[in-house]
Amino acid sequence: MNDESNNKFSEYMINMSYHSDIGWSKPVIRPYAPITISPSAQCLHYGQTVFEDMIAFNDKNNFSIFKPYDHLNKFNHSLTRLEMPTIPVEPVINTLIQLLNIDSSININEENSIYIRPFMYATESKLGVSKSEEYNFNIIVSTIPKQSDQSLPNAISLYVEQELVKSIRGDAGYTQFGGSFASQFLAQKQAEEKGYDNVLWLDGIEKKYIEEVSNKNIFFVINNEIVTPKLNGSIKPGIMRQTMIELANNLGYQVSEKEIAIEDIVLANDNGILSEVFCTDTLNAITPVNRITHLNNEIILNSNQRSSITQQLYKAYKDIQTGKSDDIFNWTLDVKQLNEVEA
């Protein structure tokens, strides 16, 4: 394992390159190493950079990747918005399977999972505001510790941002474009200085409707109904967001995707019908929320009780992840079985 700033990366990575005249090279596995790039590479000046998050885990002693096709199709959707060439999904997944099987530094067991980071950037060396004709695509992987038991991740507090804007409909804020994350850092710093863990973003026009929490989608439980902001062109279409919607429906809960005004959440809390709030993302799956502050309104929550909907969803997801429940949704791709078939 390569240790960089407390992140332990595997010994190998995946690489392929693109030129507009010849298209994509074949994806190859090579040693994990620093990347050499020209000072005039367009990614450094005009922002053509995109990344995605994926995760793999132990499933009945087999090595499984969670929704790899969904994640890479989402990655391609981001690339299209940034006028970058889409990647060939099947060859990339096949090469990823090879990497996970041959890299002895990846210690996958019931005590950890594997974080997979595909990323792509423009490499053409020229100055001038135009799209690049050359790109580099890589995948790096690292081991991450698993929760010690089936308990939820620690609850977080949210500060509702009133001045700064994360995204508006029509821009690239709904994608995994690097700049859409960098633009959130100032608000994140200000929220932390006020004693909060993260920022709850409102829409960029009226600053009235709830959108998302930085790199997470958000859900509310009101009168035993689960509600989440509908995708509107400025909210990231998180893979875990869709996963939890499907899980909730399967558990018999009603899920509504709609515009949610922050004032309606404050009112629901005042009326005693807001019981839980949770966020979703690839790395943590579900993170409960214990406090939201909007102007002079403070909402205190207990979203991580054992009987909570948040806990039920987390357990249902973890049971599929660890093989305790059958994967009736066909979400996981079993690496070892595929490797045996191909052999």
Protein language model regions, located:
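Helix-start/capping segments and mature chain N-termini
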Residues: 1-99, 119, 126-343
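Extended, Lys/Arg-enriched charged tracts that mediate electrostatic binding to polyanionic substrates
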Residues: 109-121
